[in-house]
Amino acid sequence: MEKTFQFVIPALMGVESTVAHELKKLGLSEVRAENGRVLCKGSPADIPRLNLNLRTGARVLLSLGGFQAKTFEELFEGAAALPWEDYIPREGRFPVKGYSVSSQLHSVPACQSILKKALCKRLGRVYGLETLPETGTLYQVQFSILKDAVTLMLDTSGDSLYKRGYRAQNMGAPLRETLAAALVSLSRYRGRDPFCDPFCGSGTIPIEAALIAKNRA
């Protein structure tokens, strides 16, 4: 039986429903929009598929687990209990970053430090090392703490998905490509009619509309 993953897709505020609609069109299951993010479930094969085809989401994060934590001890123990060795190899680099909102553990640098220590303890025990080399591939660890509920994730995207790679140079005050794609989606443009943006600036919205019309990732 194929393994099922929980994905967390960060989204710009106000376009979560648009991201959710796109995920449903891409065939993801149990799609649920929340403030600033959309949750869904899929298979390992969906990881590259989402990173290639998702137009409106910011990143594709793989959720490894969640728990309640009001103290640093609870944060440490909860993180150390997760099977990090299933995802991070012996030489993997695993920096930690994230945010905390409306929680007892409000210091982000302190949470980063505690989580790093928890991962080092778990991985060091599994691999039989006192000090992990961290000389290999990058495995960016992300955390969110919202009202004392901790979610730990791995970033599968690298650069944010708004960095499409089609610009030879940046223009002043650019519109993010993910937001432009969301605006085109909200306009219900499907590529069959003419598209006009009289105040197109650096052309982000028409470019995203053209990609949708051509069905290009």
Regions found by a protein language model. Give the residues of each.
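Non-catalytic nucleic-acid substrate-recognition regions in nucleic-acid-modifying enzymes
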Residues: 2-139
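Glycine-rich, histidine-containing beta strand-loop boundary motifs that form or position
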Residues: 35, 154-156, 199
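Beta-sheet entry/capping signal
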Residues: 140, 149-151, 192-195
